[in-house]
């Protein structure tokens, strides 16, 4: 038996946006096969724009990236005619219509093969001025633009990324060149938009000491402002997730940025990047095990010194564990994010304690409705069902507890209900490995067990 204790009277701050993603709703308006309604219902708080150009439904080769919007670097940066905004306009409008806020990555999509947009700009300041106009288009209406109020603007992506063959898919210059480029761009943009959150650099690996040292030495020399620091991590265990977050905080603190907002804005289950391990990783991401890993990491992120977590990827691709890529129907991973969104609806995190490394949990309350999300995850492929004793305190009875399960047979479907009259009680549940469980506790208003309740999942 595994014990899980939850005290809804012990408040631990706001439920953080651990269920943010990369990219927005997908599908064909012509064919009417999109996932817009499901995407909207999931309640993703933010969508980061990265690798968006790889999907035609987002505008393809004409969308998001700086070199795709401003296609001739020698053109006049002040002339609206130098920009192609329309494909990105449509994409961002769809994200905003879904109720998801936009997190705009300024730079280029990853380039594993032919290199076009990942070369160092030949004029760093002009590149920053081009970005200024992109920001003004989407936030201030410039060039027949919009007023989206996009707060987060990230400079570049994974300058430190290296493939096994030694090639660099995201930055064709040196680490030092990138640091100089970033310094110019960040200082210029922050000077133009002091009210916005300007940050980066989306480290591929926070464990690369040479990259971090080259970058932060220039940042400190130039007193570069950071509204947030971003980094990426792919792993196959919750311990690796926890260790990576701790390493990032250690590195940032060592260079004097320990109190800066920290965002892990690419992550997913990856056991290996090549051959059979890569194929296994992709299969896992799209199944229940990948969904359990996502739920576990979101719960762990909530209790970590981390401000936002952004899953890669909601774009139709091999690493999308949220929607299938043929018909855009929800996969098991979708329900992990929808369940975490149910916690964010309540606003305030409540204390949880577990006795097992394989049990990850997070709880939330608004003072009347209480919800607990937990999953059993370990990096194995089979294990016995375990009894989980859920000890609950800090509620006012009588209450009805409803358990929603996501497993191989169910997708966030009601599993059982039980009424409790005491302020402290225990609920026993047979929990499968990789099962994801959301417990909702609501007051019973009148009529006892068959009376009305306030639940609405």
List each model region and its residues:
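Conserved, mostly hydrophobic/aromatic
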Residues: 21, 95, 134, 153, ...
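Carbohydrate-binding surface patches
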Residues: 355-397, 433-440, 447-448
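Substrate-binding cleft and catalytic face of glycoside hydrolase catalytic domains
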Residues: 42-236
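Aromatic/acidic polysaccharide-binding cleft in carbohydrate-active enzymes
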Residues: 268-360
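Short, acidic/polar
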Residues: 27-39, 209-219, 291-298
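C-terminal beta-strand-rich structural cap/linker in extracellular carbohydrate-active enzymes
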Residues: 420-457
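Glycoside hydrolase catalytic-domain groove-lining segments
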Residues: 230-278
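Mature N-terminal, pre-catalytic/accessory segment of carbohydrate-active enzymes
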Residues: 1-38, 42, 446-457
């Amino acid at each position: 038996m595994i014990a899980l204790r939850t005290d809804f009277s012990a408040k631990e701050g706001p439920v953080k946006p651990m269920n943010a993603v990369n990219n927005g709703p997908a599908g064909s308006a012509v064919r009417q096969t999109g996932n817009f309604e499901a995407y909207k219902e999931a309640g993703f708080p933010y969508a980061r724009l990265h690798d968006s150009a790889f999907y035609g439904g987002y505008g393809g080769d004409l969308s998001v990236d700086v070199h795709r919007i401003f296609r001739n670097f020698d053109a006049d940066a002040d002339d609206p005619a130098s920009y192609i905004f329309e494909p990105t306009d449509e994409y961002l409008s769809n994200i905003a219509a879904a109720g998801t806020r936009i997190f705009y990555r300024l730079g280029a999509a990853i380039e594993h093969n032919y290199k076009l947009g990942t070369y160092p700009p030949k004029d760093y300041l002009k590149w920053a001025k081009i970005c200024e106009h992109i920001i003004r288009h989407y936030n201030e209406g410039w060039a027949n633009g919009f007023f989206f109020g996009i707060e987060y603007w990230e400079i570049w992506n994974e300058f430190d990324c290296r493939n096994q063959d030694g090639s660099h898919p995201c930055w064709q210059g040196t680490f030092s060149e990138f640091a100089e480029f970033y310094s110019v761009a960040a200082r210029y943009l922050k000077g133009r938009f002091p009210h916005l959150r300007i940050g980066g650099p989306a480290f591929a690996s926070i464990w690369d000491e040479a990259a971090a040292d080259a970058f932060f030495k220039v940042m400190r020399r130039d007193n570069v402002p950071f509204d947030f620091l971003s980094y990426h991590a792919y792993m196959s265990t919750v311990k690796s997730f926890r260790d990576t977050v701790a390493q990032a905080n250690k590195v940032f603190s060592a260079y004097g940025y320990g109190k800066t907002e920290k965002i892990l804005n690419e992550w997913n289950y990856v056991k290996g990047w090549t051959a059979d391990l890569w194929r296994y990783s992709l299969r896992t991401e799209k199944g229940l095990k990948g969904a359990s890993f996502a739920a576990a990491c979101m719960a762990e992120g909530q209790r970590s010194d981390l401000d936002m977590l952004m899953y890669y990827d909601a774009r139709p691709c091999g690493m999308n564990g949220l929607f299938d890529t043929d018909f855009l129907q929800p996969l098991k991973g979708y329900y992990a994010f929808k369940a975490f969104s149910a916690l964010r609806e309540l606003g305030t995190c409540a204390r949880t304690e577990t006795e097992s490394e394989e049990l990850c949990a997070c709880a939330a309350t608004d003072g009347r409705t209480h919800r607990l999300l937990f999953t059993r995850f370990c990096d194995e492929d089979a294990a016995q069902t375990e009894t989980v004793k859920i000890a609950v305190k800090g509620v006012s009875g009588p209450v009805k507890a409803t358990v929603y399960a996501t497993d191989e047979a169910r997708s966030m479907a009601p599993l059982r209900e039980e009424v409790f009259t005491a302020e402290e009680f225990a609920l026993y549940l047979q929990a499968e490995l990789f099962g994801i469980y959301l417990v909702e506790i609501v007051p019973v208003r009148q009529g006892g067990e068959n009376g009305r309740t306030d639940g609405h999942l």
